[in-house]
Amino acid sequence: MTVQSKLQGRGKFKKRFFRAGQQVPRPTLELSSVWLSKIFYNPEQHHNKQKMIESGITTRMSGIHENPGQSHHTSAQDYRLLTTDPSQLKDELPGDLQSLSWLTSVDVPRLQQIGGGRPDFTSSAQSSLLERQTAQLNSMTVAGGAGSAIHLQSEMQHSPLAINSMPQFSPGFPCAASVYQTAPQQVLTFTQANQQCSPGGLYGNYNSQNLFPQPRITAHSQDLQPKCFPKPIYSYSCLIAMALKNSKTGSLPVSEIYSFMKEHFPYFKTAPDGWKNSVRHNLSLNKCFEKVENKMSGSSRKGCLWALNPAKIDKMEEEMQKWKRKDLPAIRRSMANPDELDKLITDRPESCRQKSVDPGMTRLPSCPPGQTLPLAAQMQPQPVVTLSLQCLPMHQHLQLQLQNQSRLAPSSPAPAQTPPLHTVPDMTNSSLPQHPAKQHTDFYTVHTDVNSEVDALDPSIMDFAWQGNLWEEMKDDSFNLEALGTLSNSPLRLSDCDLDTSSVTPVSSAGGLPYPDLQVTGLYSSYSAIDALSNQYMNTQGGTKPIVLL
């Protein structure tokens, strides 16, 4: 190739790679060195470099040259890279290629290695060596019977940079002692069981083994994860009522309501604290709950107690049963112990349990002195009340039994539309006989403000019993229904009514015995009969006359 053709090729290279305002791209070391060695080859320099190589590293490279099946010819590229004087390349290079003189910098470390007596191998020699060793490992098979041993010999070879190279397994691969230093042999013994395998198969089987069975790991991880409980479908008012119903006293502080909800519904253990505000709001605003006095407020226990409104207990139980019928599986999933659901709904504290009452009898609750009891609000739509009053101790021989039969008719007018009272004869000026051995005293005193010996509203003296149809009995007894007095809700005094005294025969000349005030609200009353002992003093001609009690 002539110089002109070389220059033409250089011109193409210049047009292709050189651009205005750009630096020369740096090609790889291998391509640049080959390209330069082909263009600038000088036989004289080749002869000088060959002498230097023979004197320096020929003996050390003999191990590679003597390998069978491998020929190593020193190329111009190797000699070019071993140039010791970078100025020679600079002088030989044309002016337009002097910028490529940085390629000669690779000679400095190589010359230092040669001077220090440490051999270096080219990348091509190392790659060919590794390829042969890999092929030998893959082609080698190890055969053995039961109890036979396989001896694998490995030699540790040191590279120029003190890095261990791969072990040699083939005895037919010679290695010069001057280049490689053999380390002590390591004998590895493996016991095989009637199988043929390669070293790659051995390592592959080992790597594919699992130290722990996968199902066991999965089960263990599932045990560590806590069970997730959904939010209960019950409203906060139902949950609060459930907590109060299952308490010993029927009342709890707010903190114990929280504890009950977290114990039976674990969702609230990890839920945000906003649910506690909802509980407090329900306690304050819902009429089903009422605040009660804390009897232990003087001790270390502080805060108020909350209890169920007794009138709302049945309503709350109905609400719980409704949600239970609506979605029972969802409720059971949200509970820590689903078997306790029925117990939580139906149980009541002792203070809230209804006392068993005779189906034929009911008792009127007591009323504080000086107050009237609204009987009309406590009675069923059609009750018949029999009032039995005991006599005072000073009138033990005179038994006066007042049986007042009344009925709250469904068609009765409202208190604001109550018609005026029927007037009856006045008996305030009449006198009743008294026992000969007794001094004159008041005949009957029921007013609670005056006499504390008799409590007209005490259940021990007032007994209310359910009777049959009042109107049929009145017809049989020839009662005059039109004469029944109709009362308003305001208390009525007997002293305000006029009673007929023409049929009453006074026995003594003592002063009249006035009736005291008897207060009862909202009853239709009639005087039906008197005791047999009083027949000698009072004549009941023409049937009984209705009088108004209260």
From Swiss-Prot:
It comes from the Eukaryota. One of its GO terms (molecular function) is cis-regulatory region sequence-specific DNA binding. Residues 231-327 bind DNA. Keywords: Developmental protein, DNA-binding, Neurogenesis, Nucleus, Transcription, Transcription regulation. InterPro entries: Fork_head_dom, FOXN1_4, TF_fork_head_CS_2, WH-like_DNA-bd_sf, WH_DNA-bd_sf. Disruption phenotype: At 36-48 hpf, mutants exhibit pericardial edema due to dysmorphic hearts that fail to loop and form and atrioventricular (AV) canal. Hearts show continues peristatic pumping rather than coordinated and sequential beating of atrial and ventricular chambers. Endocardial cells remain squamous and AV myocardial cell shape fail to occur. Isoform 1 is expressed mainly in adult thymus. Isoform 2 is detected in adult skin. Isoform 3 is expressed in adult brain and embryo. Prominent expression sites include the olfactory placode, the basal layer of the olfactory epithelium, the neuroepithelium of the developing retina, the germinal zone of the differentiated eye, regions of motoneuron development in the neural tube and periventricular regions of the brain. It holds the Pfam family Forkhead. GO terms for biological process: amacrine cell differentiation; atrioventricular canal development; heart looping; heart valve development; positive regulation of DNA-templated transcription; positive regulation of transcription by RNA polymerase II; regulation of DNA-templated transcription; regulation of heart contraction. GO terms for cellular component: nucleus. It is found in: Nucleus. Residues 402-411 have a biased composition (Low complexity). Its main location: nucleus. Residues 402-437 are annotated as: Disordered. Transcription factor essential for neural and some non-neural tissues development. Binds to an 11-bp consensus sequence containing the invariant tetranucleotide 5'-ACGC-3'. During development of the central nervous system, required to specify the amacrine and horizontal cell fates from multipotent retinal progenitors while suppressing the alternative photoreceptor cell fates. Drives commitment of p2 progenitors to the V2b interneuron fates during spinal cord neurogenesis. In development of non-neural tissues, plays an essential role in the specification of the atrioventricular canal. This is Forkhead box protein N4. It comes from Danio rerio.
